């Protein structure tokens, strides 16, 4: 090709429109919240339970995430294990596991609860789903040995399965009363003395929110 031809070819190459690279859009992250009445929103108006308040909190912080409410009132760790496979649907990227409160209320052997939670986490491992374990703290109703075994199962299982861990679901609404007894703060609890009211849920969301953000980050990684 002569000098003129080369010049024309270079000019045409420079003049050709450059196609802009399409920005890579992060896909929506889907998180299932496997839990009991605390997750389901027992006793609260629609939109005031844990999952909708947490969804609003995450939306407000710019996360592209969709939460699935897989909370069933009265459920134990055994119930969670029985339904974990269908909770881990094809579109689920991450799972919050917040179970064990009803096991505690019923005095179920912590060894049984531990085995059930281990089964739930193993199912998530097999499905390639990232997990956040949210623990509960046992009061000393059943003795120190029971309390120690119950409290230890959450962090130990989370570590064994490489899951994220948040220590206490109800920690944000617990404290000392005027008599020096540890328990739930009355202004954040419904009349039944067990379940958080809407203001209590808001405090819980603020408390567990950063751990859920960490789960979203993990679950959203390719």
Feature annotation, model-predicted:
Residues 40, 76, 140:
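Flexible, glycine-rich phosphate/dinucleotide-binding loops
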Residues 21-73, 83-91:
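Serine-esterase "nucleophile elbow" of acetyl-processing enzymes
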Residues 63, 79-222:
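Alpha-helical cap/lid subdomain in secreted, periplasmic
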Residues 15-17:
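N-terminal signal peptide c-region/cleavage motif recognized by signal peptidases
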Residues 45, 74-78, 111:
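Acidic-and-aromatic substrate-binding clefts and catalytic sites of carbohydrate-active enzymes
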Residues 19-21, 25-27, 48, 53-55, ...:
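Residue-identity detector for glutamine
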Residues 1-8:
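Bacterial N-terminal signal peptides that target proteins for export
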């Amino acid at each position: 090709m002569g000098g003129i031809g080369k010049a024309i070819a270079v000019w045409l190459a420079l003049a050709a429109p450059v196609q802009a690279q399409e920005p890579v859009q992060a896909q929506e992250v889907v998180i299932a919240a496997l839990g009991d009445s605390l997750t389901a929103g027992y006793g609260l108006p629609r939109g005031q339970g844990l999952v909708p308040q947490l969804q609003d909190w995450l939306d407000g912080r710019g996360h592209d995430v969709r939460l699935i409410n897989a909370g069933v009132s009265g459920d134990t760790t055994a119930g969670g294990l029985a339904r974990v496979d269908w909770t881990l649907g094809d579109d689920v990227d991450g799972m919050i596991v917040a179970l064990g409160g009803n096991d505690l209320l019923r005095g179920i052997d912590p060894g049984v609860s531990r085995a059930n939670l281990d089964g739930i986490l193993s199912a998530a491992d097999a499905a390639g789903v990232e997990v956040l374990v949210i623990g509960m703290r046992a009061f000393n109703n059943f003795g120190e040995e029971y309390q120690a075994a119950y409290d230890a199962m959450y962090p130990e299982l989370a570590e064994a399965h490489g899951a994220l861990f948040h220590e206490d679901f109800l920690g944000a609404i617990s404290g000392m009363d005027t008599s020096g007894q540890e328990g739930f703060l009355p202004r954040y609890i419904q009349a039944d003395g067990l379940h958080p009211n809407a203001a209590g849920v808001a405090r819980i969301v603020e408390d567990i929110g950063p751990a859920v953000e960490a789960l979203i980050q993990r679950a959203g990684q390719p």
